[in-house]
UniProtKB/Swiss-Prot annotation:
Highest taxon, organism lineage: Bacteria
Similarity annotation: Belongs to the thymidylate kinase family.
The name this protein goes by in its record: Thymidylate kinase
Xref: HAMAP family: Thymidylate_kinase (MF_00165)
Disulfide bridge positions per record: none
Tagged with keyword Kinase: yes
InterPro entries xref list: P-loop_NTPase, Thymidylate_kin-like_dom, Thymidylate_kinase
Signal peptide positions (record): none
An example Gene Ontology biological process: dUDP biosynthetic process
Amino acid sequence: MRGRFITLEGMDGAGKSSHIESIVSVLEGRGLEVVSTREPGGTPLGEKLRELLLHERMHVETETLLMFAARREHIAEVIEPALARGAWVVSDRFTDASFAYQCGGRGVPCEKVEALEAWVHPDLQPDLTLLFDVPVEISVARLAAARTPDKFERESAEFFRRIRNGYLARAEAQPQRFRLIDGNRPMDTVRKEVLDIMREFKA
């Protein structure tokens, strides 16, 4: 049986990455093989591209193309082989992030991102996407108190507002796979909701 593909999305500072370990533990507790990965990255080449994408200045279309180049490698080398052998894949970001960050945040025409999506993975979509949502002001405040920011995390509040709107538009357009999670609550409360969703989500 083919595995399931679960993605976690949300703008920087929304808290999504904090819950990956708990999700993996729940799935492994069912006796499933779980592959935990991330974008950009997930492969040796993808991690090199990640460094460029997070820290180097570049044209917005170059950024978009590099994101999808890393994604193509990630799908071919990690995601598809894992799903084919029956493993469940849990990824910190996938293509929804390109619609939010490159289309929404950077202003790349959405039809270009749609064309890349159709070319790079025409038959692959997440089975479940957990979208962690917080007000822009909370995101910015969390980032200011955290580690040294990358180039995305140094962007303006308006940039993050466009990202948030991009994510919410994706969730509204594809409600069958999205679960919207209020990340502006205590960590334990958010984790309980995440784990409840995962326990209800079956193959």
